[in-house]
Amino acid sequence: MLLSDRDLAAEIKAGTLALEPFDPALVQPSSIDVRLDKLFRVFNNHLYTHIDPSRQQDDLTSAVEVPDGEPFVLHPGEFVLASTLEVISLGDQLAGRLEGKSSLGRLGLLTHSTAGFIDPGFSGHVTLELSNVANLPIMLWPGMKIGQLCIFRLCSPAEHPYGSAVYGSRYQGQRGPTPSRSWQSWRTWPTR
């Protein structure tokens, strides 16, 4: 069940949903707007001939911190990692979905490629996968609204929420945009 504004307020008051920093003015009818942090990870395309998710490629991205009062310029066709300003923490009976903002989508900004789902028990900054599909550069200002967080209540609490020892939870407590750690639990399954 998708939570409404009054449900979101109740979960925040109960401590089962937390955003830090939190601004009540960002609560919408069925979501909470989240803002862009000033940390980005850009791809070092000149260092690799390809990306292999089964291998550790530490130099694939480099951290960039945007100076106060300056934008990050995302050029057409570029893909970068960024993160929410807010640390988002979900209880074991809540799951989240990060969606883009319609106004930014209409300018050609994609907020996430595939990873918009947030598991119950997660706590940390949410990594954004930003792409510019427009024909002009897009100025990304730290502190601007970048997405909206939708919260869903599970039918029952997760038996093993994110952050528990069962799953490893590679991104629990992440600060800023975190590069892929797919290689840490890489495996393939038979195709026949």
UniProtKB/Swiss-Prot annotation:
Biological process terms in GO annotation: dUMP biosynthetic process; dUTP biosynthetic process; nucleobase-containing small molecule interconversion
Entry superkingdom: Bacteria
Enzyme class at the top of the EC tree: hydrolase
Reaction catalysed by this enzyme: dCTP + 2 H2O = dUMP + NH4(+) + diphosphate
Entry EC number(s): 3.5.4.30
Biased composition (Polar residues): 171-192
GO molecular function, one term: dCTP deaminase activity
Pfam family for this entry, one: DCD
Transmembrane segments: none
Keywords (A to Z) from UniProt: Hydrolase, Nucleotide metabolism, Nucleotide-binding
Active site location: E129
Residues that coordinate or bind dCTP: K101, S102, S103, L104, G105, R106, D119, T127, L128, E129, Q148, Y162, Q174
Region (Disordered): 169-192
Pathway(s) the chain acts in: Pyrimidine metabolism; dUMP biosynthesis; dUMP from dCTP: step 1/1
Feature type site, description Important for bifunctional activity: G116, F117
Coiled-coil residues: none
Sequence similarity: Belongs to the dCTP deaminase family.
Subunit description: Homotrimer.
Function in brief: Bifunctional enzyme that catalyzes both the deamination of dCTP to dUTP and the hydrolysis of dUTP to dUMP without releasing the toxic dUTP intermediate.
Protein name: dCTP deaminase, dUMP-forming
Originating species: Salinispora tropica (strain ATCC BAA-916 / DSM 44818 / JCM 13857 / NBRC 105044 / CNB-440)
Gene: dcd
